[in-house]
Amino acid sequence: MKTIKKNKKLPLTQAALRRKAINAGVKFIAEQTVFISEDTKFGKNVLIEPYVVIASKVSVGNNVTIKSFSHLEGSKIGNNVVIGPYARLRPGTKINNDVKIGNFV
């Protein structure tokens, strides 16, 4: 019989990660279609539309909208930003404040 070590930290499920984000003030249009990484950092007044993937090492500023079918990875997003729809932000991407980003970035 296998047991789990007491001190081993188990990764949070997607439902738990989304609930944590909601409790921090993030708004989802269809939360069950969004996947976020455990290390994602969210500012205030963030709206995430359906079918978004936020992979590891992403920080999202205040007043940000992430539109449908966008994929973010290793990116830093400033304040007052609109991303997507269909945007792909690759590792190392830095989006300044007051920017609108379309697809294929």
Could you tell me what each predicted segment is?
Residues M1-T33, S37-N45, N80, D98, ...:
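Terminal amphipathic alpha-helical/low-complexity segments used for targeting or macromolecular assembly
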Residues K27-I29, F35, K41, L47, ...:
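Extracellular beta-strand solenoid repeats
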Residues M1-K6, E49, K67, G84:
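Structured N-terminal alpha/beta-domain signature
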